Amino acid sequence: MDLSPRNRPLLESSSLDSGGSLSSLDSSVFCSEGEGEPLALGDCLTVNVGGSRFVLSQQALSCFPHTRLGKLAVVVASYRRLGALAAAPSPLELCDDANPVDNEYFFDRSSQAFRYVLHYYRTGRLHVMEQLCALSFLQEIQYWGIDELSIDSCCRDRYFRRKELSETLDFKKDTDDQESQHESEQDFSQGPCPTVRQKLWDILEKPGSSTAARIFGVISIIFVAVSIVNMALMSAELSWLNLQLLEILEYVCISWFTGEFILRFLCVKDRCRFLRKVPNIIDLLAILPFYITLLVESLSGSHTTQELENVGRLVQVLRLLRALRMLKLGRHSTGLRSLGMTITQCYEEVGLLLLFLSVGISIFSTIEYFAEQSIPDTTFTSVPCAWWWATTSMTTVGYGDIRPDTTTGKIVAFMCILSGILVLALPIAIINDRFSACYFTLKLKEAAVRQREALKKLTKNIATDSYISVNLRDVYARSIMEMLRLKGRERASTRSSGGDDFWF
């Protein structure tokens, strides 16, 4: 009889109650599709997965010899044939417990996930369990010895996208947890004044840890905003502006940023690792141009006019870097951090978006240039000028400085705008789903951090007998409710945007 996955004996299962037994089942449960007569009870085995019992055909399981149950069927057959000899393999190597008398084998796994595994044994097709995250489903099928490449084509694309997103966020979470553990356990456990450095670090890096930290965070945000506004006013030539006052304000803001960076630098022990972090690099780039500008201006006093012009250009370039101060708000904004995570994760989608735009710009700019070049006073003087027009048209900005005048040119412009709308809509939906997932993941993490800090503070107060009467259960319940609320918002957001495939 052919035992191929499409033509093998039909596998039947039954979930029994606690009082059920193998002999109480009707013999039709064990009927094979090819022969039309019941299989012998000795050809079946009972597996108990998470409290649910399933009666399976050993003959059908043997069609999958590389899976856990396929190996179990072979081991059970060998065990029956050889008995309890030393050479016979034991079924306990493949299951958590066994009852050889009733031919029942126990597995402490999810019975809901096992139903998908059972369907695979029946049909040879593995479908993804939507109620389980991708990584948990992968752990389940790996336990049963099924490769993820066996997932059917209808679920494969959705599964691998969810798995990639889960792995990325888990890696980010593990990295952040390791960094947090490194800072709390290594940076302050050694060196002078560990308690002072720990408290100072909490004020600088954890705005919600105390009242002083919240005040410091607000002041830091104010200085960033004042610095940006001051930079904009210094570039404006207005008669009522006091440039000397603006310069003094610039010195004050730079002094604050410098002191903040030095305090962070002095608090940590691994300073090389501190300087490699992106937020600290941004802080350094925000203050270095100011000091380099002062140094260049002080050294350019005895140079010629040409050299002074070159120095002036260098100073202007360095002053442009002051705009990076806006990125300092990322320390206090979950949205900005989520944007950074999204760009990091969606580099393929962003590259695809740029590729689509580049192809469209190249095609439509060339067509538009040749359609408009016969007009005497045309604004399409060259293909690069047409590039600018195609860019503003495909992104639906439309400055109007360059526009077509001929009928053919207007038809091409309509097609350019329409293609831009369609092309931009494709990857942006994916990027939006990733941003929503990253944002709510960070919010959940912040809620967990606040819960951990509150529990640590209560534990410390209890240890010193200086605590106020607080119900620890209520604190824990409030934190859990906050995380559940955020998780519910995440589900609602992903479903409303059509992003069920990215919910994990």
UniProtKB/Swiss-Prot annotation:
Taxonomic superkingdom: Eukaryota
Membrane disposition: Multi-pass membrane protein
Gene3D superfamilies xrefs: 1.10.287.70, Potassium Channel Kv1.1, Chain A (3.30.710.10), Voltage-gated potassium channels. Chain C (1.20.120.350)
Locus of motif Selectivity filter: 396-401
Chain segments annotated as transmembrane: 215-235, 243-263, 281-301, 314-335, 350-370, 411-431
Entry GO CC: intercellular bridge; voltage-gated potassium channel complex
Main subcellular localisation: membrane
Residue numbers spanned by region Disordered: 1-22, 172-193
One Pfam entry name: Ion_trans
Annotated keywords: Cell membrane, Ion channel, Ion transport, Membrane, Potassium, Potassium channel, Potassium transport, Transmembrane, Transmembrane helix, Transport, Voltage-gated channel
InterPro entries: BTB/POZ_dom (IPR000210), Ion_trans_dom (IPR005821), K_chnl_volt-dep_Kv (IPR003968), K_chnl_volt-dep_Kv8.1 (IPR003970), SKP1/BTB/POZ_sf (IPR011333), T1-type_BTB (IPR003131), VG_K_chnl (IPR028325), Volt_channel_dom_sf (IPR027359)
UniProt biased composition (Low complexity): 10-22
Sequence ranges on the Cytoplasmic membrane side: 1-214, 264-280, 336-349, 432-504
Protein location: Cell membrane
Known function: Potassium channel subunit that does not form functional channels by itself. Modulates KCNB1 and KCNB2 channel activity by shifting the threshold for inactivation to more negative values and by slowing the rate of inactivation. Can down-regulate the channel activity of KCNB1, KCNB2, KCNC4 and KCND1, possibly by trapping them in intracellular membranes.
Domain comment, as recorded: The segment S4 is probably the voltage-sensor and is characterized by a series of positively charged amino acids at every third position.
Protein name according to UniProt: Potassium voltage-gated channel subfamily V member 1
UniProt gene name: KCNV1
